[in-house]
Amino acid sequence: MVRAGAVGTHLPTSSLDIFGDLRKMNKRQLYYQVLNFAMIVSSALMIWKGLIVLTGSESPIVVVLSGSMEPAFHRGDLLFLTNFREDPIRAGEIVVFKVEGRDIPIVHRVIKVHEKDNGDIKFLTKGDNNEVDDRGLYKEGQNWLEKKDVVGRARGFLPYVGMVTIIMNDYPKFKYALLAVMGAYVLLKRES
């Protein structure tokens, strides 16, 4: 059963109607919708790769996953990063870094910087809301971070926008349902 909508649209009332709509499409319409979906996915990937090149960061957008940086950033804030190698690292700067043996990058503030005569830089980080520095988070035997450990430096943020990502990771069924709805929408959307 299909409810009436705006001119040129229709709204399926059950998940079975979605499959019925797919069966009603001729091959040409189905290929067009699949191609449309593929173009959306490839456009998103091209935009992401373009951001990587423009920002110099392997991950130009990250979500704050804990409260360790409060009050500066809260859980769910979306951070925009850059990572230009020629920019010096300074105390007070907020960096995102990876630690060997951990999959998820950490967002913390640089509290100490040591620069050697040969130009090598080592630095120490700490979460604003943490009591102690991050030496306990670094790999065993590592007391300082180096520039190679930095994924990016925070240049801007959107508050709480990343909560969607956190919810999707905490509730995988929600993530798959959302992806299925979006995929069905793209496949079933008809040009008017």
Swiss-Prot record:
Keywords: Endoplasmic reticulum, Hydrolase, Membrane, Protease, Signal-anchor, Transmembrane, Transmembrane helix. Gene3D superfamilies: Umud Fragment, subunit A. GO terms for cellular component: signal peptidase complex. May undergo processing at the N-terminus. Residues 1-28 are cytoplasmic. InterPro entries: LexA/Signal_pep-like_sf (IPR036286), Pept_S26A_signal_pept_1_CS (IPR019758), Pept_S26A_signal_pept_1_Ser-AS (IPR019756), Peptidase_S24_S26A/B/C (IPR015927), Peptidase_S26 (IPR019533), Peptidase_S26B (IPR001733). GO terms for biological process: signal peptide processing. CDD domains: S26_SPase_I. The active site is at S68, H108, D134. The keyword Hydrolase applies. The chain crosses the membrane at residues 29-48. The keyword DNA-binding does not apply. Residues 177-188 are annotated as: C-terminal short (CTS) helix. GO terms for molecular function: serine-type endopeptidase activity. It is an enzyme of class 3 (hydrolase). It is found in: Endoplasmic reticulum membrane. Its EC number is 3.4.21.89. Residues 49-192 are lumenal. Belongs to the peptidase S26B family. The C-terminal short (CTS) helix is essential for catalytic activity. It may be accommodated as a transmembrane helix in the thinned membrane environment of the complex, similarly to the signal peptide in the complex substrates. PANTHER family: SIGNAL PEPTIDASE COMPLEX CATALYTIC SUBUNIT SEC11, SIGNAL PEPTIDASE COMPLEX CATALYTIC SUBUNIT SEC11C. Component of the signal peptidase complex paralog C (SPC-C) composed of a catalytic subunit SEC11C and three accessory subunits SPCS1, SPCS2 and SPCS3. Within the complex, interacts with SPCS2 and SPCS3. The complex induces a local thinning of the ER membrane which is used to measure the length of the signal peptide (SP) h-region of protein substrates. This ensures the selectivity of the complex towards h-regions shorter than 18-20 amino acids. This is Signal peptidase complex catalytic subunit SEC11C. The gene is Sec11c.
